[in-house]
């Protein structure tokens, strides 16, 4: 931090990012130089063959060129190790060294081309020497190609637009010119992000919904990154420091007092009943993912189990299946739920932006009509997730501020139209009129199921929804309170998705800036220690962060320090209305319903692969998920199969200890 300025533009590469790639190149070049020197010294007396003078000259010049490159790369690595993330002063000579290093590519390319031309002439010399020359030519071009790929990756399309402007634009321009300039920069940033999103999702169709999703996603990213000059390695270092800081705080904090029951809060028996319901309905949410999740959960036997059904010819039994040409999804759903053919009302695997797959089945054990919505599993689903603007819902209920996540609300409306207008629910209740409507889903599907329950509650007052790992940024405060009567959310451990919202991402950005500003260690040490700590553990106290007196004074006010550092060290980036010091354009949204948190108690290894973990179920408040936690299980805990195993474990433990007093967790209103 900040990104380097080379050739008059900013690049997505900091001057302290070259320790690891430089060390790797240094190792490769030294090894290359030793091999070339050995080859020359061993075979120099055999180079009296036709064309041997050319090969001898090639090796001598190559050795000299490699020596110069090695010295330059060594200097780059040494300079890159100096200073800290927010103190690039000791690395001010880095740009000159990089200019020298890039200039050395020209003679290297010329010499590699000459070597290839000379070898192509069919020089009649010792075969070992010729093979060695061919190897050096190949390695030269591999290094050059790798460098070109790296340049493409660190190229910042906005670097040329932002770098020439002074750091405080409003002081140099009148208000109208300043506003026009900032508007132009924001438009350019959004255009660049939209191009990136379209490139990443090039296989997604180009209908109206997709174009709207592209624009919404680009707007989200351009707004989020508009006021920072962070490069990707800065974010990785910030995650590492936050992980250790978070563990340090949790180790020093006293264990929370367990409250089994207070007046007006849910009884422990209700918690047991809801955990059992979650255990029952989670397989339906998992089944909505179809055969990919089934194969993932059963890697050795899954294909054999559903293979026969995949190859079976479609007959009348499959009339309710939509978008499953080879019946593999249907076969996996049958295996996952254990239901019969006659229990399925409708299965849709139609998948577009704002249009999610879902299944409708009859659950005779719980006497319910279950609608299971699939979570994120395609690029279309990702675009739905990232359409994070808020949208007002017309629900016909006496509530103010009925606002929800736009993408998920659109998906819920689509399923609502299908269920109601296409008569799918009417068909289900004509078969089982006394059954209760239950909506379930995981991840994105959990958010859609919760919103769908809100939309259907007027027609089905007894509707229930079970949202497994729902996104946090879903409902406004009023809808969150309203949904508590009929929605239960289940969150496992450190799962990042139930903590993920635009406001929480803003908070994470502030915390990253603060912890980077506080740290006086070079980036390479932060990343090395972070990898060791993440893999093997250790004490976070062994990696202190300190501040000098001047910076400490600047950081006495919240966010002032990192904001000062940004304006001080980011000449190319400027924002007069930075999201860091102004209200976010995205309102605060909340997860749906009452929340059950499955907390890990037993040790299962840092990645959950060493032994079976022990979990404790308890009622939790949404405020407990108002910060994103950094840890090795923040993604693992979101996987459906991990949640199924955790529920199996919780239910088994509760069944075994049903007579033990004091079991269970705290209750939160």
Swiss-Prot record:
One of its GO terms (biological process) is icosanoid metabolic process. GO terms for cellular component: nucleoplasm; plasma membrane. It is an enzyme of class 3 (hydrolase). Coiled coil: none annotated. It catalyses: a 1,2-diacyl-sn-glycerol + H2O = a 2-acylglycerol + a fatty acid + H(+); 1-octadecanoyl-2-(5Z,8Z,11Z,14Z-eicosatetraenoyl)-sn-glycerol + H2O = 2-(5Z,8Z,11Z,14Z-eicosatetraenoyl)-glycerol + octadecanoate + H(+); 1,2-di-(9Z-octadecenoyl)-sn-glycerol + H2O = 2-(9Z-octadecenoyl)-glycerol + (9Z)-octadecenoate + H(+); 1-(9Z-octadecenoyl)-2-(5Z,8Z,11Z,14Z-eicosatetraenoyl)-sn-glycerol + H2O = 2-(5Z,8Z,11Z,14Z-eicosatetraenoyl)-glycerol + (9Z)-octadecenoate + H(+). It is a multi-pass membrane protein. Its main location: membrane. Its cofactor is Ca(2+). Residues 39-58, 124-128 are extracellular. CDD domains: Lipase_3. InterPro entries: AB_hydrolase_fold (IPR029058), DAG_Lipase-Related (IPR052214), Fungal_lipase-type (IPR002921). Pfam families: Lipase_3. Its EC number is 3.1.1.116, 3.1.1.3. This is Diacylglycerol lipase-beta. It comes from Mus musculus. The gene is Daglb.
């Amino acid at each position: 931090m900040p990104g380097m300025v080379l050739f008059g533009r900013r690049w997505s590469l900091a001057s302290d990012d070259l320790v690891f790639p430089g060390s790797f190149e240094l190792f490769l070049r030294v090894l290359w130089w030793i091999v070339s020197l050995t080859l020359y010294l061993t075979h120099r007396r055999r180079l009296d063959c036709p064309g041997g003078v050319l090969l001898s000259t090639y090796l001598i010049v190559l050795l000299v060129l490699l020596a110069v490159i090695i010295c330059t790369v060594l200097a780059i690595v040494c300079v890159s190790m100096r200073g800290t993330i927010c103190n690039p002063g000791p690395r001010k000579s880095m740009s000159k060294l990089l200019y020298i290093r890039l200039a050395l590519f020209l003679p290297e390319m010329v010499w590699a081309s000459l070597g290839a031309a000379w070898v192509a002439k069919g020089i009649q010399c010792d075969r070992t020497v010729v093979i060695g020359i061919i190897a050096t030519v190949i390695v030269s071009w591999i290094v050059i190609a790798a460098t070109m790929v790296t340049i493409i990756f660190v190229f910042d399309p906005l670097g040329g637009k932002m770098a020439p402007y002074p750091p405080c634009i409003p002081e140099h321009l009148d208000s109208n010119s300043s506003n026009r300039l900032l508007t132009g920069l924001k438009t350019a940033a959004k255009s660049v992000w939209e191009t990136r999103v379209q490139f990443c999702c090039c296989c997604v169709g180009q209908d109206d919904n997709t174009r709207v999703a592209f624009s919404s996603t680009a707007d989200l990213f351009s707004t989020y990154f508009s006021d920072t000059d962070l490069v990707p390695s800065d974010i990785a270092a910030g995650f590492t420091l936050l992980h250790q800081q978070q563990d340090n705080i949790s180790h020093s904090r006293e264990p929370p007092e367990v409250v089994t029951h207070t007046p007006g809060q849910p009884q422990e028996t209700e918690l047991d009943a809801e955990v059992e319901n979650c255990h029952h309905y989670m397989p339906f949410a998992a089944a909505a993912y179809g055969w990919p999740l089934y194969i993932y959960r059963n890697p050795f036997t899954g294909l054999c189990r559903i293979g026969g059904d995949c190859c079976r010819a479609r007959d009348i039994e499959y009339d309710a299946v939509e978008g499953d040409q080879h019946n593999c999804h249907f076969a996996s759903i049958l295996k996952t739920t254990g239901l019969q053919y006659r229990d399925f009302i409708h299965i849709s695997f139609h998948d577009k932006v704002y249009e999610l797959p879902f299944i409708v089945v009859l659950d005779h054990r719980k006497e319910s009509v279950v609608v299971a919505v699939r979570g994120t599993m395609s690029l279309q689903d990702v675009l739905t997730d990232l359409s994070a603007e808020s949208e007002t819902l017309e629900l016909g209920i006496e509530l103010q501020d009925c606002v929800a996540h736009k993408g998920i609300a659109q998906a819920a409306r689509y399923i609502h139209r299908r269920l109601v207008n296409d008569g799918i629910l009417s068909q289900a209740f004509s078969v089982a009129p006394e059954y209760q409507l239950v909506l379930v889903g995981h991840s994105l599907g959990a958010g859609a199921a919760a919103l769908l329950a809100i939309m259907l509650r007027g027609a089905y007052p007894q509707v229930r929804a079970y949202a497994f790992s729902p996104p946090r940024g879903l409902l406004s405060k009023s809808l969150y309170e309203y949904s508590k009567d009929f929605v239960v959310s289940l969150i496992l451990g450190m799962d990042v998705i139930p903590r993920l919202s635009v406001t929480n991402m803003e908070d994470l950005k502030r915390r990253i800036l603060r912890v980077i500003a506080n740290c006086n260690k070079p980036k390479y040490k932060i990343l090395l220690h972070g990898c060791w700590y993440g893999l093997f553990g250790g004490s976070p106290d062994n990696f202190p962060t300190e501040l000098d007196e001047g910076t400490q004074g600047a950081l006495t006010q919240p966010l002032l320090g990192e904001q000062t550092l940004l304006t001080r060290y980011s000449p190319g980036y400027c924002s007069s209305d930075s999201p860091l010091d102004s209200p976010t354009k995205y309102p605060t949204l909340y997860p749906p319903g009452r929340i059950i948190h499955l907390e890990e108690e037993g040790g299962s290894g840092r990645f959950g692969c060493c032994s079976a973990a022990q979990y404790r179920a308890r009622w939790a408040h949404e405020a407990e998920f108002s910060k994103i936690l950094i840890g090795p299980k923040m993604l693992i805990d979101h996987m459906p199969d991990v949640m199924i195993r955790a529920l199996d474990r919780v239910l088994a433990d509760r069944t075994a200890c049903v007579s033990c007093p004091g079991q269970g967790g705290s209750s939160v209103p």
